[in-house]
Amino acid sequence: MKTKLKNFGLCYICLISFSINAERFGDPGEIIAVKASSDDIDKYLTVEINESLYKLIPLPFEKQNESIYVDDEKITINQKDFGESRITIENNSMVNLSKEDSDRTFKESKIIQKALNNYSKFLVPDLNFMNPVKGIISSRYGKKRYINNQPRSPHLSLDIAAAEGTKIVSPTTGRVILVGDFFYAGNYIVIDHGYGLLTSYSHLSKVFVEENQIVTKGEKIGAVGSTGRVTGPHLHWTVYLNKVRINPELLIQEGYLESLL
């Protein structure tokens, strides 16, 4: 899939040092543009910059201080301190799970992972994202997490706090591929935007869409809630590119790409 640069007005793309075999650096959760060939069009999300074709490569959080290789390019992912988040959940059964709940979460993780592994080419993605909800950012991407002082997996999403019932919209056009009520995520939606770009929405109080439904940019898909394992009403928003969780905040920063060119 190829799209013009203008479709990426709000997406962070690192455009530095495209020389062959040069080592490049980026932060975890970012996207880097790598020179592409016509053979890459059906395999990657690509963008045309100054009449040259580039494929968009996500930088995994888990590979900090490591290098990945894309064709002839070496990309080293920086070590970055995103800070930490400590929360207390009064309901201990949501932290130290019973066997029944543990079995449930295991089954649910398989369902969710199957959806997130989806790769389709039905739609040309538009990375000119809009903010899915009006609220206050309560926890940013990359934070170390502690729940009741127990270390947990890092927070690779964006939490936006808002009043119960606040409208949530699709940040760009896509197809709903999963709707469900899950132990951790509560009422949950996954949207496929095409070519490995997916978004998910957790802890909703209401869901206004169905599986296989096409949603357009700005269309209402749900409402903020506190279902699942939470401490209060908020949207837990995750963005995936090629199965890598990238920083959602980069996609909604107005004029971010233009500032790099």
Predicted ranges, named:
Residues 2-9:
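Bacterial N-terminal signal peptides that target proteins for export
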Residues 12-21:
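Hydrophobic h-region of N-terminal signal peptides that target proteins for export
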Residues 20-91:
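Cationic-aromatic interfacial patches
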Residues 70, 167-176, 206-224:
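Short, well-structured beta-strand-loop connectors
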Residues 76-185:
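Surface-exposed, glycine-biased beta-strand/turn segments
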Residues 84-94, 98-102, 125, 210-217, ...:
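Acidic, glycine-rich catalytic/binding loops that coordinate metals and/or anionic ligands
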Residues 161, 167-171, 201, 212-215, ...:
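Small beta-strand-rich domains/subdomains or short beta-sheet motifs embedded
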Residues 171-205, 233, 238:
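Zn2+-dependent peptidoglycan hydrolase active-site motif and core
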